[in-house]
Amino acid sequence: MFISTNLKKLLIIGFLVEALIFVCCYQMTDNWGEIFRLSARYSGRLSLIIYLICFFHFTFSFIKKKSSQKLKNSLIVFCFLHYIHFIFLALSVYLNDLPIIPLKLTGGFIAYLMILIYPLMINMIKKMIYHFIFYYYVGIVFAATYLSRIQGNFEGANPETFHFIGLGSIVASFILFTILIMRFQEK
């Protein structure tokens, strides 16, 4: 598979940012469980930002009715970085002996599968509804995660200002991008 120079640069920058997150968290504490918990927290925030960039690129690719290399690149970067986040998260759960609740895990598991598969299949998907399902489902999983933290239902993560910002940015992007897509379809 041919990887463009721009994509390589984005992947390297993304990896370096994830490494910087880990190093900063390593400097904050000497407890490995806490290091990976903090790394997962900040890596997840980075993933949210990249997801919103992907959703932005998708919306404008849809409006222009043409495939965008920026969209494909941002999706590959999102997939790559979100799997680094998954490693941090899995190690945090393991090292901190956090309980695994299968019902809550199912939604996230499906989202991770979609994040892995979608960048590989984006060019093969002809029905627009499947693209919408990807963006809205992954966004809903992000939103549910932040809402759970805000409500205090997430062990090891007290409510923070960023949780409100994260949830608000997801809701705002859903509203804005849905309006843009619907207006375009009316024309």
Where does each model-flagged region fall?
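Membrane-embedded alpha-helical bundles that constitute the cytochrome b-like, heme-associated redox core
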Residues: 1-187
